[in-house]
Amino acid sequence: IPIPSMKEQQKVVDIYIQAQVERTRRHQTAKQQLESIDDYLLDVLHVDKNQATLCSNGYVKNISTILGNRLDVSFYRNRFELISKKYSNFPLSSVAHIDPSISFRGYDVNTPISFIPMECIDEIYGEIHVIKSTTILQSKGYTKFEEGDLLWAKITPCMQNGKSAIVKNLENGIGCGSTEFFVLRPRNNNVLMDYIYLLLRHHEVLKAAQSSFGGSAGEQRVSSQYLKSIIIPIPDYSIQKDIVAKIYNMKSQAKQLQKEGDKLLEEAKQKIEKLIFE
């Protein structure tokens, strides 16, 4: 390998360290930007962010909230309710279909459709970074969904890591994927799927859902009953749109910061190569 002078070696080190420090700074700022989304949601929806954790020794519940639900303590322990002091609040099941019935009947079995396994969803931004392809013939045994549906992971650790995304640009408007997804769809045009998606990505919602896990160690899941029982505020449609636009803008800014940081480091590496080899 070429050995430049001590002065040139120090210059190389300085260039790299400076770029690495700047990249780290921008990535950290992006991380803080993403984390601030949770506080923004609670503030704009007038939800109490200082909810006390329920006492572990006992619970007092209205009989109306228990009927039809599980009776085990984990179902009610450490719940974080998105109850607004300003807007009307509803159980998730009253505003969204959860695992709606979906049939591919009427399609030719060789019709190409999208295939989305768990690993295709980015947990940081909640987006699908790769869409694979399959056919209706090969979709048997998988979770089925349609254009615009929300996929929300039910199993640990995918759920608490944020494996959720809205499916878009599906082949022929339909797809299939992991059986460990819940599929959600708005019940009417008064609720934005993007709005529900953002609420269900809130850190406290995911943390509370983790407390409700059932199943054996290593394969614990959130039950559909728990998901249906989550309370969410529903402001006017125009307010939902404003909230979604604001948060998507915050996410875009975070992405841009990360890209800038990565670009600075890559440019520094190229500069170093020129110094050493040219």
Q: Can you annotate each of these PLM segments?
A:
Residues 136-139, 170, 216:
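Short, solvent-exposed loop/turn positions at domain surfaces
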